[in-house]
Every structure is written in C-alpha cells, then in structure tokens.
C-alpha cells in the first residue's frame, strides 16, 4: 500500500513538472522526484528525472549532482562500461571540477565491482594526493582501511587508515563507521591476546597430570573463541577463519554454555555459503 501511494505521488509530481513552464520550478520538481526515487531504489525513474534536472535546472550544484547520480545509477544497474566512459569524459571537463573527487570515487567503486583491486588502490592513493582534507579523501581512507582488512589482512594498516577519516573531514558520513572499525579491531587484538594465553595454559598440566584450566576458565575461553569467530565471520567477512574458531570451540569446550550457540552459528554460516545445497 505504501509503495503504491509513493508511486502515485511520483506520478502526480511528474505530471506537475510536465505542465509547469518555468524551468527553475520544473528543475526543482524533477530534482525532488529524482532524489526520492533514488532513495527508494527506483532507478529508472530516478535516471529519467535526473536527466530532466540536467536539462531544466538553473542550479549548477543540482546539475552536477544529477550528473553524478546518473553515473551511480549506470553502475548500480550494471552498465559498467557506460558508467566508466561517462565518468572519464566528465573528468576532462572543468565544468565538473567541484565533483571530481566524487567522480574518482565512483571509478574506484567500478573497479571494485570488477575486482580490479590494483586499479582501485591506485585511484584511491591519487584521491588522497589530489583532494586532501575533503569528503572524497575521507571516504578514500575508509575504503583503504577496508581493503587493508579484506585484501591484505593488515590490521595495523587498517587502523592507520580508519584513524585518518575524521582528520581528513570531520563531518564525513564515514567518521562513525571508521570509529566502529577501530573498536572492532581493538576488540579483536585483545581477544587474540587472551586466546594465545588460554592456548598456552591448555597445554600445561600440573605434577599430578591435572589440566590447568578450570571449568570457569574453559567457559571464559569459549567466550573468547566465540568472540573471535563472530568478528572473523560477521564483521571481517573471513568466513573460513570464523569456521575454524567455531570448530575449536566445539572441540575444546563441549560443555560450555556457548556450545549450542556455536553449533547454530556454524550451521547458519554453512547454509549461507550453500554448503547444504
């Protein structure tokens, strides 16, 4: 019902935009239609409306934004060649200079979508050099931080990149996600230190042959292992490593209260990976 109402509202706005003669007002209405449609992922309508904004709006900022959103829609619709060509053409036109940084980031996302990670990294590094202290450079640092995790598994480098986000542009929408990433990495490092300590103790027995880990110790150890499995699987997208930790919990601490939860988490992960198909 809500979707139908939204669609009808857009229909009425489009009719109004078609009738209105004043290009300024016409451009404003089409810009509103385009933004709402983009937010609701109705990309065909959004693209058509952004083209009308480009044609009618008297605002340079709106026209630039409409061009940027248009190439984003090409990418989201899978028209990667068109998106790439359009962006490269725009980067040669000084009319679009205020959004050059954003266009460069769109190229990064296009490269990423095609798994061209070397090209993406090179473009990100150039963004840091060419557009320092901007929204673009802040986002570039955030993406580089995620690449340090996903491509290199270098958490120290990731921390450095995430730490730069707020320094580059304190109002960036990536400041909070970067802080969350820092928190996740810090938690992971702390858990690894505890994990190593428990693993060392697990191998130690006293003179009577009694293991050094008490029942409480094993339950605490299970909590550490589960925390690592959760971070690996659901935060860092390292599914194989997450499964390794879950298997360890299942094998080493079968009497832990977390044992059933580990079995369930493993089943969910394997199901999502298509293991049971």
What are these regions, as identified by a protein language model?
Residues 1-277:
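Acidic, polar-rich low-complexity tracts and alpha-helical solenoid repeat scaffolds
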